[in-house]
Amino acid sequence: MLQKWKRCCKIESCYIADYVRRNEENKMAIVTTTEMFKKAYEGGYAIGAFNINNMEIIQAITEAAAEEKSPVILQVSAGARKYAKHAYLMALAKAAVEDTGIDLALHLDHGADFEICKACIDGGFSSVMIDGSHYSFEENIEVTKKVVEYAHARGVVVEAELGRLAGVEDDVSVANDDAIYTNPSEVEEFVSKTGVDSLAIAIGTSHGAYKFKGEAKLRFDILDDIAHRLPGFPIVLHGASSVIPELVTEINECGGNLSGAKGVPEELLRKAATMAVCKINIDSDIRLAMTAGIRRVMTAQPDVFDPRTYLTVGREEVKKMVKHKFTAVLGSNGKA
C-alpha cells in the first residue's frame, strides 16, 4: 500500500494532516475522519461508527455502506482485539475496502492508554480514541496530548472523552453512581491544550443493552452549550444503540433472556445528528441483530449444524439494521 499525504485541513485553530492509505490504483482507501466530520457537521447528519468482531459483521456493515452510499467508520474495541487479533481485523478491513470499493475509517474504540493507541497507530489504524475519562481533568489532558502528538506526526486523528458514561461493554464498566455528565465549561480548555480532533461527551447515553430504567432522556442543553463553545467541532456520542425492540422480542421468543433491555430512542439520536454530533457509536444493536438471526435459525431448524447457514442469516440481519441506521437515524445515506 502506498502512503499519501493530502492537504492539511483546518479544524478550528488546529491543523492536522488528512492521512490516507490508498492502493496503487487510488480507487479505495482507509481514510481519516477529518473530511467525513467536516461534511457531516455542515450537512446536519452523523457518521455511524460500528463495532466489528468478525468477518460477517464487517461484510454486513461495508456492504450496507456501499449500497446506501454512506460514509462509515469501523471501530475496534479492546475486546475485539483480544477475540479476533489485530492482524486479522486489519486484513479483514482491507479486504472489505477492496471488495466493496468504498472508503472507510478504521478506529480504535476506548484506547485505555498510550501504548494501545501507539500499537494501533503503528498497525495501520487511521483514527484512535484515548479514553482518559477515568483520570482527573489534568491527567486526562496529559495523556490525551501525548497520544495526539504521536498520532498527528503520523497522520492519524484522535478522539478523546470528557465525562463518563454508565454501563458495561467489553472492558468498559462504569457504575451509574460513577457516571458524570460532561462539564461544558471544561471543553474549550481541554481541546485547546490537547489538540484533539473530536470529543466524546456524556449527555445521558450509556453502554450496553440496559441504558434507561425510566423515560429515556438526553441532555441536549449540555450538547447545545458545548456546540456554542466549540463551533464547528465534531462531537461524538458513545453508547448510542437503540436496542431495537423487535430484535429483543425475537431473541426472547427464541430462548433468550433480555428482560428490561432498553436503548436510546431513534428520534433522539436523529436530533443529535442534526446538531454538533458527527459520530454515533453503535455496538449493542449489531450484537442483537446477529443474535436474533442466529437464534431464529437454530430455533426453526434445530438440526442445522453448518455455521454458514446461521451466520448468513445473522449477517443479513446486521446488514438490514445498518442500512436502517444510515437512512432513518444518521441521515448519512447518499453522502459518500
Predicted regions and their residues:
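Long, repeat-rich segments with strong aromatic
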Residues: 237-243
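C-terminal alpha-helical cap/extension of soluble enzyme domains
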Residues: 253-258, 264-336
